[in-house]
Amino acid sequence: MAIPVAYARDGDCVLFHGSTASRLFRLCAAGAPVCLTVTLLDGLVLARSAFESSMNYRSAMVLGHCSVLHGSMKLAALERISDHLMPGRWPEIRHPSVQELRATAVLELPLDECSVKISDGGPDDPEEDIPIPVWAGVLPLSEAWGSPLPAADLAAEFSTVPDYIRGWRR
């Protein structure tokens, strides 16, 4: 089973969180083997044939067993995950309540068994395909933040977007 989760690296571990009601997170917390993957698509490689067409990407896979974090380590991990997603926002936002902390499982997966794969290049058409009259090359893809959209109920005194949000780039 695969589900998208928020995560952050912390030294030689990856931290991620989910609902304590989730069957998957309960299994991970109980010591079931885990496979965590992250893939970033960088572009489409458009060759002169469907067979030779592919993608440029960066991917990582981590295998192992998770540890469950509690107390101050759990809160520190949630801050780390928050800062990975939204740099600089943790000092401004309301921190998790006791009830929210009870409903959230925070897991730590050591980076002991990892695999990284990168595909970066153009089409590798065989000689006999070069004369085919079709465009070939790479269509790059990049991730970019859009313009911030304020909440409908945002008070007027908070209508100016903070500098740290305007400066977010990936």
Predicted regions, residues:
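Short, structured beta-strand-loop surface elements
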Residues: 21-80
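General beta-strand recognition
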Residues: 13-15, 35, 108, 117
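Short, surface-exposed beta-strand-loop junctions and turns on beta-sheet-rich folds
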Residues: 8, 22-24, 122-125
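C-terminal edge-of-domain segments
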Residues: 73-170
